[in-house]
Amino acid sequence: MYYDYRRYPYRPYSPYHRRGPCLRDFGPYPFVINIREAAKANDYFRIALWTGKHLQLTLMSINVGEDIGLEMHPNLDQFIRIEEGQGIVMMGDREDNLYFQKRVYSGSAIFIPAGTWHNLINTGHVPIKLYSIYAPPEHPHGTIHR
């Protein structure tokens, strides 16, 4: 199917520059990016890459020996995909009952139901590079945590 881009209401924009993707929040506009390349290029602890009305994508970089931090989102589901590195993910129904523990590696997909306590600890020798999808959004548009 052919689409007449001259009628498209947004200016075309490429997030890529000579040194890889430019990382900022591109939501809520239509957007396409190589997510693996963007996740690996990210050095921020957390940066919102796309924030919409019902969905948000963030990139994270977890240094060796560090973690995301024990947290729980009462009203949203979360998906995490590890693009580089390794660690241990822990989940449970209470802060003091993280009964689910699994080793995770590059390529691992983690599904976190709403109301589940969770943490991800980097046990490897390189930073964990990942992307996370929240539904609905968890962080304000444009969030950057160094």
Segment roles from a protein language model:
Residues 37-40, 96, 121-146:
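Double-stranded beta-helix
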Residues 68-70, 89-90, 112, 118-128:
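Short beta-strand His + acidic residue motifs that chelate non-heme Fe in jelly-roll/DSBH
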